[in-house]
């Protein structure tokens, strides 16, 4: 009698263990399926992001991003700022030594920061633009974000006041205006200002 009870009890324990094991297996399968589904969703999202990034990159390259180019006149300048959300433009004079220094740095940055368009224009050929933007110092750099001129770099005062500044110095100064992004500790954001025109006096070393 006692042996039968013990046997029945053992069988019940075995069945209970089997039920629990089956339930665990079912839950594990659910978790595995859920993880697979999640991974598939993540994979699809990542693929879409990569496709969009590639499409955006191709479009930007077709608009002149990735290289440092000259624009001939006001029309080309405004076309560049319409097609690209972020534009950095050097106003130069032929033969100006400091403009050639900026050229060297912009050649590097244009290849590195494809999301930003780097251009230069002969200040003598865009009188309307230099008047509108109050360009009085050469070299002057206009920073345009979403068709608004948000900042200027006039001369080399903000770059250390010397000719021998690094590309990183220029890069960090541009990052303060949020026209490009750099991976570093932190950059103090520059105070944003929209400058359409106006009369401002600049006491820089190269008045034009």
Swiss-Prot record:
Expressed throughout the body with high expression in the nervous system, including the ventral nerve cord and tail neurons, and vulva. It comes from the Eukaryota. Residues 68-179 form the Thioredoxin domain. Required for normal microtubule organization and function. Regulates tubulin acetylation in ALM and PLM neurons. It holds the Pfam family Thioredoxin. Disruption phenotype: RNAi-mediated knockdown results in 60% embryonic lethality. Surviving 2-cell stage to 64-cell stage embryos display a disorganized arrangement and do not undergo cell divion. Due to short and diorganized microtubule arrangement, one cell stage embryos exhibit nuclear-centrosomal defects, failed cytokinesis, and abnormal pronuclear activity which include failed male pronucleus migration and the presence of multiple pronuclei. Its main location: nucleus. It comes from Caenorhabditis elegans. One of its GO terms (biological process) is microtubule cytoskeleton organization. Keywords: Cytoplasm, Nucleus. This is Thioredoxin domain-containing protein 9. CDD domains: Phd_like_TxnDC9. SUPFAM superfamilies: Thioredoxin-like. It is found in: Nucleus; Cytoplasm. Gene3D superfamilies: Glutaredoxin. One of its GO terms (cellular component) is nucleus. PANTHER family: THIOREDOXIN DOMAIN-CONTAINING PROTEIN 9.
